[in-house]
């Protein structure tokens, strides 16, 4: 999980989006294929250099593109064609969220397996039940664990819905009208990054996706 949210991985994911967009534009004939090969071979960045440029110009994506351009050279002019900053940032963020969701889901599935096994193991182990915070009628420890198992299964499904809700990207330009970018670029990049294109967007992926996703995540805290 730490690797997913490491700052270098954040910028690398943005670079992956940019390179994929270059590949799509090359297929459309908007970028020389030779230039794309140069970009793929040379593209890199130094995180501290990004921060250094950002302090001067106060624009993180321009700082990022400038830092990458120092490695790529003349072919850097083909990077970010027709795109707006959030085409890169929102799409890359949602890739990271998808990756993090996969880690969480895998962890919950392992937890569910353990809880199921323990519920059977302690099926006949007596324990005291509680109501109103005090002792009530007897129950079994296995039944208590089975309750946690059932809740974990629901949380797995919630996490899957949350991940699906966030698995969208957009490369549709400054106001979502594809004024300077072909919709094929969005389709190509999203498919390559494991996302689906946002149906309608402005400059950003609409934040109702995030609201629904975070609501599902908060459900884990109620157990």
Locate the predicted segments by residue.
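A helix-coil-helix interface module used to build multimeric assemblies
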Residues: 1-178, 182-192, 197
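A structural signal for small-residue-enriched, beta-sheet-centric alpha/beta enzyme cores
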Residues: 197-204
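The DNA-recognition helices of helix-turn-helix-type DNA-binding domains
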Residues: 207
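Single conserved hydrophobic/aromatic residue that forms the stacking wall/gate
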Residues: 216-223
């Amino acid at each position: 999980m730490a690797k997913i949210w490491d700052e270098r991985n954040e910028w690398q994911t943005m670079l992956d989006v940019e390179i994929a967009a270059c590949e799509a534009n090359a297929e459309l004939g908007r970028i020389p294929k030779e230039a794309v090969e140069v970009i793929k071979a040379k593209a890199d960045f130094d995180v501290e250099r990004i921060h250094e440029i950002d302090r001067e110009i106060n624009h993180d994506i321009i700082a990022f593109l400038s830092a990458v351009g120092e490695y790529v050279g003349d072919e850097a002019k083909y990077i970010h064609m027709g795109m707006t900053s959030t085409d890169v940032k929102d799409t890359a963020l949602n890739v990271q969220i998808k990756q993090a969701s996969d880690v969480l889901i895998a962890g919950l599935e392992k937890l569910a397996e353990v809880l199921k096994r323990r519920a059977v193991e302690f099926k006949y182990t007596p324990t005291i039940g509680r109501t109103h915070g005090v002792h009530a009628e007897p129950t079994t420890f296995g039944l208590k664990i089975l309750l946690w198992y059932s809740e974990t299964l629901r949380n797995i499904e919630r996490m899957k819905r949350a991940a699906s809700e966030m698995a969208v990207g957009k490369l549709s330009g400054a106001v979502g009208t594809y004024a300077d970018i072909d919709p094929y670029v969005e389709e190509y990049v999203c498919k390559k990054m494991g996302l689906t294109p946002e149906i309608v967007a402005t400059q950003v992926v609409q934040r109702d996706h995030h609201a629904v996703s975070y609501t599902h995540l908060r459900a884990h805290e109620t157990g």
